Amino acid sequence: MSTQQTMTVDEHINQLVAKAQVALKEYLKPEYTQEKIDYIVKKASVAALDQHCALAAAAVEETGRGIFEDKATKNIFACEHVTHEMRHAKTVGIINVDPLYGITEIAEPVGVVCGVTPVTNPTSTAIFKSLISIKTRNPIVFSFHPSALKCSIMAAKIVRDAAISAGAPENCIQWIEFGGIEASNKLMNHPGVATILATGGNAMVKAAYSSGKPALGVGAGNVPTYIEKTCNIKQAANDVVMSKSFDNGMICASEQAAIIDKEIYDQVVEEMKTLGAYFINEEEKAKLEKFMFGVNAYSADVNNARLNPKCPGMSPQWFAEQVGIKVPEDCNIICAVCKEVGPNEPLTREKLSPVLAILKAENTQDGIDKAEAMVEFNGRGHSAAIHSNDKAVVEKYALTMKACRILHNTPSSQGGIGSIYNYIWPSFTLGCGSYGGNSVSANVTYHNLLNIKRLADRRNNLQWFRVPPKIFFEPHSIRYLAELKELSKIFIVSDRMMYKLGYVDRVMDVLKRRSNEVEIEIFIDVEPDPSIQTVQKGLAVMNTFGPDNIIAIGGGSAMDAAKIMWLLYEHPEADFFAMKQKFIDLRKRAFKFPTMGKKARLICIPTTSGTGSEVTPFAVISDHETGKKYPLADYSLTPSVAIVDPMFTMSLPKRAIADTGLDVLVHATEAYVSVMANEYTDGLAREAVKLVFENLLKSYNGDLEAREKMHNAATIAGMAFASAFLGMDHSMAHKVGAAFHLPHGRCVAVLLPHVIRYNGQKPRKLAMWPKYNFYKADQRYMELAQMVGLKCNTPAEGVEAFAKACEELMKATETITGFKQANIDEAAWMSKVPEMALLAFEDQCSPANPRVPMVKDMEKILKAAYYPIA
């Protein structure tokens, strides 16, 4: 009694899937090693290869389509090329280990596969899908085309039996025995099926994609081949005739139209005729198109054209007999000259038979346009071929075609399935990508039947320590300007105060002592909190002058402005909008700063002991149009040379000493507790904090040696935060300074005790940075407190002690401890708090803070910071 008589379709499908699930469990057992799987594949492929002729004969006999010899070749291709391509591929367990990046890849089967096969390539497709399923340890259940059922089962049985004999699970390959379309649909929609491997007509492929599960389906092709005037004519004609006649044109990648440049049209046609192509006349064409599509060219019902299902894979002689025309006995393809591509010419549709449309191209663009029209005419995503020796034409063709395989100087049938004429993956399932409504654009192969798991070991982000290549320090170190090589055209960036104090003249005096003559241009219009508008003004002067060195002398404003002028001088295409965007990892930012130093060097000479800009990759620029302050950061902005000469600070007013000195303290403190703090920056940060507590008050009171120490402390802190970055104190201070026009050092100082206490609490929103493997800011504040001699036994005590010590230093230097003391109206301040907090969150300094600075928390800090400390 047959299976069909003893069970329903539902029972049959359930049984097949249940057996496949058992096979899947078997495949997952440890004994199925890579070596065993490869052995099974080898035995199964050889068994199918041994029967390639018998299978070809069975396919031709059952379907009545195609050519025996070509089907035999396709069977060999499925056994040989497909197996060769995956012979050394790892598909079991651990398939790749990358110790450098800490990634281990593990391959697992996707699960039970539903394999759907066509009438056009029944046995070769069954072999192909069976072998790639074995290679990936996936049980497969086939739904064979009813018109090729016997030969397909024959192919699957040969592979299955050989695989089981070699050790494969008993039900590794199965097939539906009855039920037709109903059974096929039930299999595709069965919850036990993991994926669908579908090759066939549009309706079947759409059904696969509608199943609600992953499907590897393909789309229809309408493949053009453009025979361009620079081609090898004999080769092109040979390829087209060979490809189109192969298995009577049943491969979906076969040419459906040849578009020939007018300059070589006659030669190509004659060459094709010598190879067996028969060109029909208009009367014969009318008969053929009527038979194949039910309509005639340019008739009223051309849009109703449908391919006669009897046509695919039939011989030219069969067509001649059906339509009542005569073709030579040795004719291998029928060619029909068409006027255009589209519904008006039915023969420019996909035909899957040895019938080829022929069109003449008036020029290269016309040829490409006609080919594009073919692809767009129900062939999107599949394939397109071109025969040409003009690289520019080939590239233009490839860029134009919405096809996933562009086959160059290649017969498209053999080129499309891969491995013979090129190195495309060998396959009988050709993906068409989104152009054709498919999930894959490549040739489907074993890769597509694997789930790749990735074991990712923890890896710290690469970190960096970068400072200017040359840093000169000690009193009177400005003299190095007379010795530095390659200075001839110097552009000095400064502000009017520096000019009035004679600092610019000091620089010019040293430059004039050089052994070579120098040209000097000065720009002294930099304002506090320099703007992009000022930068553009200075840049215009710089572009006219064309310097080979830029010298910035002054505080942070002059140096920051000079950095951006330098950038735009070397790279006028640089986009300020992109530069100001926030990032988490400097190396992975969305915008890449360009390489600097090709046109000029940047030499920075600080005249205040605070910003550290002379050694950092940062620049803070304001935009008068938006009223916002933007901290820019990239190592491209690191100056070429820093000259840290304390003589420029000896006459600084006390207020500037205090403001800039407290800025140094904040720089060092934030660098030390930053999530990006590291062994290279920690020592610098600690030393800077120590120098500030030992020397700031002395410097404030006029001690010249202490001023030298503070000048060094500023640069040391700059080197620390250049690599460790800053935190939320600076984020908020940037916004306060922009909104109320207060000195930067004063802003960060007022906020510092509040930020220390905030960061010193165990956070509920933890910071994200791989090297920062647990919260430790409270411990680090305690370390700083103990280093400067404060008594504390616990992190909590250390946090409070350090915050109070900072407050005491502020009071000792007569610095405000609340923004109210800056004569800011309380209502005006409070109204700005929400905006300042939000902008502070967007600030580039926020990501390195040791706890995530929540907007609401920053609002609380800003409100509290308005009121002076008692």
Curated annotation (Swiss-Prot):
Q: Which GO terms describe its molecular function?
A: acetaldehyde dehydrogenase (acetylating) activity; alcohol dehydrogenase (NAD+) activity; collagen binding; fibronectin binding; laminin binding; metal ion binding
Cofactor note text: Zinc or iron.
Q: Which CDD domains match?
A: AAD_C, ALDH_F20_ACDH
Q: Provide the residue positions that the database annotates as binding NAD(+).
A: G431, C432, G433, S434, Y435, G436
Its recorded reaction(s) are: a primary alcohol + NAD(+) = an aldehyde + NADH + H(+); a secondary alcohol + NAD(+) = a ketone + NADH + H(+); acetaldehyde + NAD(+) + CoA = acetyl-CoA + NADH + H(+)
PROSITE patterns annotated for this entry?
ADH_IRON_1 (PS00913), ADH_IRON_2 (PS00060)
Catalytic positions? C252
Enumerate the UniProt keywords alphabetically.
Answer: Iron, Multifunctional enzyme, NAD, Oxidoreductase
A biological-process GO annotation: alcohol metabolic process
Named cofactor requirement(s): Zn(2+); Fe(2+)
Q: Does the keyword Oxidoreductase apply?
A: yes
Oxidoreductase found in the keyword field: yes
Which top-level enzyme class is recorded in the Swiss-Prot or TrEMBL entry? oxidoreductase
Specify the domain of life of the species encoding this protein.
Eukaryota
Enzyme Commission numbers on file: 1.1.1.1, 1.2.1.10
Identify the GO cellular component terms for this protein.
mitochondrion
- Reported function: This enzyme has two NAD(+)-dependent activities: ADH and ACDH. May be a critical enzyme in the fermentative pathway.
Q: How does it assemble?
A: Seems to form a rod shaped homomer composed of at least 20 identical subunits.
Family to which the UniProt record says this protein belongs: In the N-terminal section; belongs to the aldehyde dehydrogenase family.
What this protein is called in its record is Aldehyde-alcohol dehydrogenase 2
Q: What is the lineage of its organism?
A: Eukaryota, Amoebozoa, Evosea, Archamoebae, Mastigamoebida
What gene name does this entry carry?
A: ADH2
